[in-house]
Amino acid sequence: LLKELDELYAYSNANKVFCVIGYPIEHSLSPVMHNAVFKALKIDAIYFSVKVDVSMLKNAVDMLRNAVNGFNVTIPHKVTIIEYIDELDASAVKVGAVNTVSNSNGRLKGYNTDYHGFIQPIKSRGINLRGKSVLLLGAGGAARAVVAALCDEGIARLIIANRSINSNVKSLINTAMDKGIECKAIILNESNRYSYDCDLIVNATPLGMVDVFNRDKGSNSSNSSNS
């Protein structure tokens, strides 16, 4: 990470620096989108991606605290990152995951924009999810935001498909059941059996990411987890 930061500062004279961290990170279009916006709005800033595996997350956060103005968080760090930042916005508390971190003089505050990023496009199309059945693939940080939004929208039935019925799945099931939603947990490869009975299917896994998922082998080339 230090090498990447040194190379970045040598290359750029930008006044503000932002990044996205994750593992894998090759799929992320965040640098393309953010840098395009910075250029269009004449903002003196640069945005880049940094590959950070789980074992390096704490060290990476410590370095970024003194190096960037803010950063985004993608798989598989959206939940674990909470341990290493100073404060949570109400959005992050509600979801239990963080995908955006602001840096105010070294104090890091976490936010969650996945909730609105998921539900707003659905609402903008006039789709009403109340009373509907939903199949959710995955049980990681993104899935937490999806479940929070689905609960608020009043769905009737939720099926969560994951590689294993782990503690993350059970936590999401409990969250939904507390809202009176009928729930079921299944293994990911059983999804086809249930998909036809659902009104909405949500993919909150790395499946489909460019250069990340090997369709022939049915596993992630990076061995990242959907947990």
Region spans (language model):
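Short, conserved loop/helix-junction motifs that constitute active-site signature segments
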Residues: 11-12, 129-130, 152-154, 216-221, ...
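Residues at the starts of beta-strands that form the adenosine-phosphate
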Residues: 17, 133, 156-158, 182
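NAD(P)-binding Rossmann-fold cofactor-contacting core
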Residues: 155-179
